[in-house]
Regions:
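S-adenosyl-L-methionine-dependent methyltransferase catalytic module, highlighting the catalytic core
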Residues: 1-122
Length: 124
């Protein structure tokens, strides 16, 4: 996925977004999305090819402009970034803290040559 270089979403980021009742991607999220966005060939990543990850798709100036746009209107980006294990851990942590009443029911982990995982959540 083009988020390959983006840092994983943290618990504090999720809690802050919840407390602020953010309903659309915030400018910092938009900035990260466009700053770290790269062309990625998932099959080549799994095969450890040197050319699997391309150059960044946007300049710093373009990323800043999208972030500024996000202060005025909706900009479509991935708001949260997790690997399969990070997501599972986050759901467990949020549940243990009493923030959510969901548990992972089933998970299909990321498998070669793909770049996604699938999860079904369940209320206890």
């Amino acid at each position: 996925t083009y988020d390959i270089d983006r840092p994983a979403t943290t618990l504090s980021q999720l809690e802050t977004r919840h407390k602020l009742r953010i309903t659309r991607p915030a400018s910092d999220t938009v900035l990260e999305h466009f700053t770290f966005n790269r062309k990625v060939d998932a099959g080549k990543v799994w095969a450890n090819h040197n050319d699997a990850v391309g150059e960044r798709r946007f300049t710093a100036e373009q990323a800043q402009e999208f972030a500024l746009q996000a202060t005025r209107s909706y900009v479509d980006v991935h708001c949260n970034v997790f690997s399969d294990s990070e997501f599972s851990d986050m759901i467990e942590t949020l549940g243990a803290a009493g923030h959510i009443s969901l548990r992972v029911d089933r998970m299909v982990p990321t498998r070669a040559p793909f770049n996604e995982f699938h999860v079904a959540l369940r209320k206890p």
